Amino acid sequence: FAQTKSTKIIVDGVCMMCEERIEKNIIGLKGIKLANWNLENRILKLVYNEKKISLDEIHKFLASIGHDTNKEIASNQAYNLLDPCCQYRDFQVVKDHGLDRKPIHGSNKKEQ
């Protein structure tokens, strides 16, 4: 069991669709044992086998499906594929979800 590690990653998102996308996609990766993303604090709790997948690979994968992490920024192309409801870089979308926060890496749309 020495290869199994627990970690927490900050992953941006604003709704239950984001939660489902993040958890369902990440759990499908080889080496991921557990994935649980919290909408309120944006923390993804992971248990993974470091011999099968690295933390860097996990960050890159999350960015590839459109979600910024505390270490990796999703390309505009990947981000723009998200449902409009999930576009967490847009202040109005965040506000519409009843949230009062900025994206992890700042915003590319008008804020307040």
Predicted regions and their residues:
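Short, solvent-exposed mixed-charge patches
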Residues: 110-112
